[in-house]
């Protein structure tokens, strides 16, 4: 019953396929019937179930309205109220895959990919931190990617603003939250009485290490085991570092240190890891939060120097002030009414995603320090839009290929060119250097060295690619509120797939690549017909 889609959603969007489902929601790939834009629709089940869920829904919507204009942060295009007054629909720009799927696939990320992905993550994190907002849940599955290696940070349900907290560190209490254990900072694991922006920098270090290693750096099976893996790898904390955490945490850390055997970070990484990557990792994975590199400092590190361009690294000049004080938890009806009020305000401003200030300037832009409207390379670098999807690709849909809105939202198509050339630290190309080809991320694992791939391996790669790539996408901008009154013209009915067309990727390992591609063998598969026998060469003395 939870998966029933409201009629207003069906009238506005053509649902293509389900991308994922969990205990709290479901995500579909869909096409806007009016514009042809490919989007991702997230339905949050019972979004206002209790105070915690209501607060998380409220935070995600408000913070995405504040930061969604950044080229490396996912854009919230629409917020739609469900008819049952419990669920809520969030419409996002569509991305092909996520970093977790790419890492699990193995062999797809080259050194230049790792550097560019991490640079874009640092750009997004710097923008958040400049508004004094901490994400608190940065992990590979929350880093979305496309084939142009463009990064979009998503899932702001656990993010919070530190601007409304008292200035005294003793008053910045840590609220309990459920984040993925493998990327939690030591102070979070130790239930320290305060936290800082350094929580995100630790998570970024874990993400970088996982991209370099191909698997998680600290895959703890419990909070205690997680802490043990960390403390036996990073340099031991000083007495001053332990005192800063509080007396309750100090005894726990000292007990865990003990006489356990130690290892170094370089022992966990491949032998060909660059010295710059190892140095950056060591500066991020530091026990004391105030001794870790900040996002601004990390952007100046030699590891990402080729992409570093200060004019393209946005920062806010003022803290983000949430619509509800972080230290005060509202009631469920109050959170619900505030979210619905935001939807009404968006609908009254011709589809814009932000409230307008006294001079028509949105709050997210009122204190934004960015030299240009859209971050891009110097004018000598050609700007290229998203690559067109081949007509022969599996699952190609003409409705997804062209987007009337795409031509109107040029500033949203600006992050891919950041990766199309090697730059000096000042954002200029080295003297005499030629323009580098566009950086793309092949989402299919390459086959053996120099050997021509067999038909079976080609089929297996194609099916695996279907499971990894979500499809083409077009960028958009601004939150819109769907109108229930307008009924768009009907599209021609889709061909209904047969039962054999489902779950081919999941059964590929058991049935083979060729069968997975065909969706199952027919009775004629693997047999030789009479006409084929007639063309076989006959040996001498055996003519009929």
Curated annotation (Swiss-Prot):
Keyword tags: ATP-binding, Cell junction, Cell projection, Cytoplasm, Cytoplasmic vesicle, Cytoskeleton, Golgi apparatus, Kinase, Methylation, Nucleotide-binding, Nucleus, Phosphoprotein, Repeat, Serine/threonine-protein kinase, Tight junction, Transferase, Ubl conjugation
Gene symbol of the encoding locus: MAPK15
Regulation: Activated by threonine and tyrosine phosphorylation. Inhibited by dual specificity phosphatases, such as DUSP1. Phosphorylation and activation in response to DNA damaging agents, serum stimulation. Constitutively activated when phosphorylated on Tyr-177. Activity depends on the relative rates of MAPK15 autophosphorylation and dephosphorylation by PTPN1.
Lineage: Eukaryota, Metazoa, Chordata, Craniata, Vertebrata
Protein's recorded name: Mitogen-activated protein kinase 15
PXXXP motif repeats: 371-375, 378-382, 386-390, 394-398
Modified residues (Phosphotyrosine): 177
Family the entry assigns: Belongs to the protein kinase superfamily. CMGC Ser/Thr protein kinase family. MAP kinase subfamily.
Binding site for ATP: 19-27, 42
Modified residues (Phosphothreonine): 175
Active site: 137 (proton acceptor)
Molecular functions (GO terms): ATP binding; chromatin binding; kinase activity; MAP kinase activity; protein kinase activity; protein serine kinase activity; protein serine/threonine kinase activity; SH3 domain binding
Effect of mutating residue 155 to A: Unable to induce the formation of autophagosomal structures. Is able to bind to MAP1LC3B and to colocalize with this protein to autophagosomal structures. Does not induce phosphorylation by methyl methanesulfonate. Loas of phosphorylation
BP-aspect Gene Ontology terms: DNA damage response; dopamine uptake; endoplasmic reticulum organization; intracellular signal transduction; negative regulation of cell migration; positive regulation of cell population proliferation; positive regulation of metaphase/anaphase transition of meiosis I; positive regulation of spindle assembly
Region (Necessary to interact with ESRRA, to regulate its subcellular localization and to inhibit its transcriptional activity): 265-285
Residue(s) carrying Omega-N-methylarginine: 449
Function in brief: Atypical MAPK protein that regulates several process such as autophagy, ciliogenesis, protein trafficking/secretion and genome integrity, in a kinase activity-dependent manner. Controls both, basal and starvation-induced autophagy throught its interaction with GABARAP, MAP1LC3B and GABARAPL1 leading to autophagosome formation, SQSTM1 degradation and reduced MAP1LC3B inhibitory phosphorylation. Regulates primary cilium formation and the localization of ciliary proteins involved in cilium structure, transport, and signaling.
Compartment list: Cytoplasm, Cytoskeleton, Cilium basal body; Cell junction, Tight junction; Cytoplasm, Cytoskeleton, Microtubule organizing center, Centrosome, Centriole; Cytoplasmic vesicle, Autophagosome
UniProt organism field: Homo sapiens (Human)
Class of this enzyme: transferase
Post-translational modifications: Autophosphorylated on Thr-175 and Tyr-177; activates the enzyme.
Description of how the protein assembles with itself and partners: Interacts with CSK/c-Src, ABL1, RET and TGFB1I1. Interacts with GABARAP, MAP1LC3B and GABARAPL1; controls, in a kinase-dependent fashion, both basal and starvation-induced autophagy. Interacts with ESRRA; promotes re-localization of ESRRA to the cytoplasm through a XPO1-dependent mechanism then inhibits ESRRA transcriptional activity. Interacts with PCNA; the interaction is chromatin binding- and kinase activity-dependent and prevents MDM2-mediated PCNA destruction by inhibiting the association of PCNA with MDM2. Interacts with DVL2. Interacts with CLIC3; MAPK15 does not phosphorylate CLIC3.
């Amino acid at each position: 019953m939870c998966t029933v889609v409201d009629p207003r959603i069906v009238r506005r969007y053509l649902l293509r396929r389900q991308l994922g489902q969990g205990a709290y929601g479901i995500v579909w790939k869909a096409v806007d019937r009016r514009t042809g834009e490919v989007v991702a629709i997230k339905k949050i089940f019972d979004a206002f179930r209790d105070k915690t869920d209501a607060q998380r829904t409220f935070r995600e919507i408000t913070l995405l309205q504040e930061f969604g204009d950044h080229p490396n942060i996912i854009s919230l295009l629409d917020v739609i109220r469900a008819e049952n007054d419990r669920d809520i629909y969030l419409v996002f720009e569509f991305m092909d895959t996520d970093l977790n799927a790419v890492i699990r696939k193995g062999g797809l990320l080259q050194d230049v990919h790792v550097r560019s992905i991490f640079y874009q993550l640092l750009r997004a994190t710097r923008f958040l931190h400049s508004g004094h907002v901490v994400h608190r849940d940065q992990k590979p599955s929350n880093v979305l990617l496309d084939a142009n290696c463009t990064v979009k940070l998503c899932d702001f349900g656990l993010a919070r603003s530190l601007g409304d907290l008292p200035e005294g560190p003793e008053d910045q209490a840590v609220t309990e939250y459920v984040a993925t254990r493998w990327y939690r900072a030591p102070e979070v694991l130790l239930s320290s009485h305060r936290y800082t922006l350094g929580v995100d920098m630790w998570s970024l270090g874990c993400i970088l290490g996982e991209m370099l290693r191909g698997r998680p750096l600290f895959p703890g099976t419990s909070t205690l085991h997680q802490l043990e893996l960390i403390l036996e790898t990073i340099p031991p904390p000083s007495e001053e570092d332990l005192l800063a955490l509080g007396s309750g945490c100090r005894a726990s850390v000292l007990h865990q240190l003990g006489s356990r055997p130690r290892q170094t970070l370089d022992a966990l990484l491949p032998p060909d890891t660059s010295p710059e990557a190892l140095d950056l990792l060591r500066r991020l994975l530091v026990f004391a939060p105030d001794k870790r590199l900040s996002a601004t400092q990390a952007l100046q590190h030699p590891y990402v120097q080729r992409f570093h361009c200060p004019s393209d690294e946005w920062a806010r000049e003022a803290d983000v002030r949430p619509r509800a004080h972080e230290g005060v938890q509202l009631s469920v009806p109050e959170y619900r009414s505030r979210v619905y009020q935001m939807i009404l305000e968006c609908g009254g401003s011709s589809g814009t995603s932000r409230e307008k200030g006294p001079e028509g300037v949105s709050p997210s832009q009122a204190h934004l320090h960015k030299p240009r409207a859209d971050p891009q390379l110097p004018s000598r670098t050609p700007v290229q839009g998203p690559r067109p999807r081949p007509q022969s690709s599996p699952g190609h849909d003409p409705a997804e290929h062209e987007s009337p809105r795409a031509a109107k939202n040029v500033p949203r198509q600006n992050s891919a060119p950041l990766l199309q050339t090697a730059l000096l630290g000042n954002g200029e190309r080295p003297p005499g250097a030629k323009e580098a080809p566009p950086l793309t991320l092949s989402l299919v694992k390459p086959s053996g060295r120099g050997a021509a791939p067999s038909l079976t391996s080609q089929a297996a790669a194609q099916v695996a690619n279907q499971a990894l790539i979500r499809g083409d996408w077009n960028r958009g901008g601004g939150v819109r509120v769907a109108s229930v009154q307008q009924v768009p013209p009907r599209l021609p009915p889709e061909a209904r797939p047969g039962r054999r067309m489902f779950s081919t990727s999941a059964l590929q390992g058991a049935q083979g690549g060729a069968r997975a591609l065909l969706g199952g063998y027919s009775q004629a598969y693997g047999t030789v017909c009479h006409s084929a026998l007639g063309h076989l060469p006959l040996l001498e003395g055996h003519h009929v």
